Amino acid sequence: MTQLSRILHIEDDRSIQAVAKVALEAVGGFQVLSCASGAEALAQLLAFDPQFILLDVMMPNMDGPQTLLKLRELVDIRRVPVAFMTAKVQPAEIEHYLSLGALDVITKPFDPMQLAKQVREIWTRSQNASPTGTA
């Protein structure tokens, strides 16, 4: 199994972005590219070649679900697992995010010391899944 090393984190809140970046780099040992908007992420996507995308739901101009739809046009989402991050954790909303192709939803506020572990668990699940999406 390939080892996870490159994470694209799309988050408009600079303080959350900074905490997540430090946690993922220092605790997880990942290389993290942080983008403040969906448009910025789309511009950086191909050059960075992420192995995992961590995507905020609520952002101005292009929200997380809209960004995910645009990302799908550029990369094979089955090859690049996506997890949404949100404070909106109602079951219907989570179901909607998963129906868009996200593998999981990480709730905010998050524990910085657990974030790398959560991402690694989602990554491992994605690598163990068959092409049809079942284990």
Residue ranges of model-derived segments:
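Short, glycine/charged-rich "phosphate-handling" switch motifs in NTP-dependent
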Residues: 103
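C-terminal output helix
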Residues: 110-120
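The C-terminal output helix
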Residues: 120-135
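Conserved acidic segment of CheY-like receiver
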Residues: 3-15, 20-24, 53
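Receiver (REC) domain active-site loop signature in two-component systems and cognate sites
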Residues: 59
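Acidic, metal-coordinating helix/loop segments flanking the phosphotransfer/catalytic sites
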Residues: 34-52, 69
